[in-house]
């Protein structure tokens, strides 16, 4: 189930626009709703959702507009523990299921525990421990994650916990092979999950192959690149010095290197096949190909989770 963090929509100062877009994409499926904590991605109306006044009245009313929304309990630094707990209890009563998102391991755990013990049933909540970007610091982050899980389970043994992280870098240049056009990026999220004890300890989660920091759009020349998801890595093809036609060349190389994408039944694979025959209508920008990577990554993680759950082995070709 996705966690969607709302921020400002381009050319709009109304956070409702972002919610409407999210509801449109999700159709009638449930999703977990949060609000960005990055001030640069707020708009005037989104700041109001974080106000602790009247027990977070603005956020509660906002989340009550659709039955498919599972709200994240807001825990800004300005809020008192009592206000956060009241918010959690009211949301539990109104929505049934709620979520907590622990970003700061030093302050958010206590806020979460105080709220969990005040609920009618702590099992109505899922607790996300969001570790952010983990590449280069896996050992320390693993230890911190285990300690956080232990703190929660000591007080609430029945707590439902999921650990979120991402290892996708902000730049792929350090992962290029000698040709400067392709390379592999190792996926660390699954390794982290196993190191903390696997599914017996926490539910697997990640950032969908998105870097943890959202950068504002920078006007300038881009390098066409297409990324695909493998079992334990992302593979990319990039074409420095080319314009959008570089996506066509990258797609051709991906299908030559990994021909199973010729028959994979996913939207992302279909976009790669289209590009390989020269059809990049509506796909001429990097943002479109990030969406392809996310789609392929999510499909791969669902496949891997099902394999782990049911304990069966795929053919080697299927797990490429």
Model-predicted segments: where are they?
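Alpha/beta catalytic barrel-like cores
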Residues: 1-70, 75-77, 172-320
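Eukaryote-skewed repeat-based solenoidal scaffolds used as protein-protein interaction platforms
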Residues: 55-215
């Amino acid at each position: 189930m996705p966690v969607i963090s709302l921020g400002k929509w381009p050319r709009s100062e109304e956070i409702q626009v972002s919610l409407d877009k999210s509801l449109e994409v999700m159709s009638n499926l449930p999703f977990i709703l949060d609000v960005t904590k990055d001030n640069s991605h707020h708009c005037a109306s989104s700041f109001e959702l974080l106000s602790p006044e009247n027990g977070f009245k603005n956020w509660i009313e906002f989340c009550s507009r659709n039955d498919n929304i599972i709200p994240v309990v807001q825990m800004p630094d300005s809020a008192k523990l009592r206000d956060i707990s009241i918010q959690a209890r009211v949301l539990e009563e109104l929505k049934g299921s709620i979520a907590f998102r622990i970003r700061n391991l030093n302050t958010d755990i206590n806020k979460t525990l105080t709220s969990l013990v005040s609920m009618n049933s702590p099992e109505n909540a899922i607790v996300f421990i969001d570790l952010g970007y983990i590449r280069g610091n896996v050992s320390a982050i693993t230890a911190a994650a285990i300690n956080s899980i232990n703190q929660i389970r000591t007080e609430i043994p029945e707590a439902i916990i999921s650990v979120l992280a991402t290892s996708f870098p902000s730049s792929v240049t350090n992962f290029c092979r000698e040709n400067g056009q392709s390379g592999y990026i190792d996926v660390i999220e699954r390794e982290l999950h196993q190191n903390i004890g696997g599914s017996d300890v926490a539910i697997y989660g990640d950032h969908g192959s998105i870097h943890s920091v959202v950068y504002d759009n920078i006007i300038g020349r881009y390098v066409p690149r297409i990324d695909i998801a493998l079992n334990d890595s992302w593979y990319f093809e990039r074409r420095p010095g080319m314009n959008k036609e570089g996506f066509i060349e990258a797609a051709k190389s991906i299908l030559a290197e990994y021909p199973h994408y010729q028959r994979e039944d996913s939207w992302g694979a279909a976009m790669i096949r289209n590009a390989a025959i020269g059809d990049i209508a509506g796909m001429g920008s990097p943002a479109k190909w990030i969406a392809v990577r996310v789609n392929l990554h999510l499909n791969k993680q669902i496949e891997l989770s099902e394999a782990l759950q049911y304990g069966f082995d795929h053919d080697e070709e299927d797990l490429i």
